[in-house]
Amino acid sequence: MVYYPQMTSRPLRLLAHLYAMQKASREMSGGILHYAAIHPDVRVQLYGIGTPRHRREEFRVWKPDGIILGAADEATLRAVEGLGCRAAVFVNTEPAVPAAMRYGSVYCDNIAVADAAARVFSGKHLGNFAFVGTRTCDAWSVERGSAFRRLAAASGCSFSEFKSPPTASANLRRELAALVDWVGALPKPCGIFAACDARAKDVLDACAAAQVLIPEQAMVIGVDDEEFICRQTLPTLSSVVPDFSRGGYIAAEMLVELLTGNRRRLPRRTFGVQGVVERMSTSDTRGTGRMVSRAQEFIRTYATSSDISVEDVAKASGSSLRLLQKNFKAVTGSTICDAIQTARLSKVCKLLSETLTPIGQIGELSGFGNNAYLKKLFHRRFGCTMRNYRANH
């Protein structure tokens, strides 16, 4: 049985000004309403973008005590003050100018969002991570990208980030063409984390244009689980689900604290992640990407320290040689032998540029048993001798 205390004063009136077309805002509004449902001394009204003018006038007459909103520009602040609000809680933003009222802010935990995406890719044994942020480089997008970069480094994975061309805002076609080139050049297989679902759709379109197979060559994850996007893309889109409802509840809780307490400012608070909804963009049902990733990991580990064969690589991948050869070529664009050779040549270049190891010993330290063969191969690949390479690097 729920106990409702007897109210001795007028209930607090909270106004939620959120964009109802977005799932995030709808679920946050639900969290705010849930707070009011279990706190009988609180009343809530919802005020969305596009609300008719006469309805806004009704809110002024209603005299809200505080407001929860997702915009913090000067015009919005002045309008909020015109409603007579004594306090405000901003969602994923801070006031653009000094505010006379009491205020606090609640943010999605962008580090937790990035971590959820990274865990999916790590669980698929992907060794190459990539990030695509918003075109406008929003602060929350930058924060997600930075966190994802750190997680990739901590996992020993390569990392790439798409940078929109400077003219992207004026030429969308050029920006999307650059994205097509970028996804085509990524090392495969890879996991691409997009800052939001709308941006993830751009990635899926770019992969289709670049003939990058999803999920065999690239797995893609967005954020927000906007079902009108995620269920209609081809393939369907996996997405991280922030706990928006919890965020709304926290926002209401903070607003009441501002209205009933003595503090004029509250420190930033965050809400976390519910989980990840996996759909076809990360569902490698045949295990192709995982098989190739295991093969690549084996090559990176042993190619330069022992005389490994393609049969050894197939055994380490848990696949037959014939199947691995087929899938390795399809996913990476190169053969297993080419991958072994590339790993060894990378070690040669590293020893030449970063150490004083005698050239006569470098072949053996890099997995090449025949120095004469190495010298010919090196010249063919780089267009110079090993000695000249060292001198220039």
PLM feature spans:
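Bacterial carbohydrate/catabolite-sensing allosteric modules
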Residues: 1-68, 76-316, 321, 325, ...
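A secondary-structure capping/hinge motif
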Residues: 328-335, 376-389
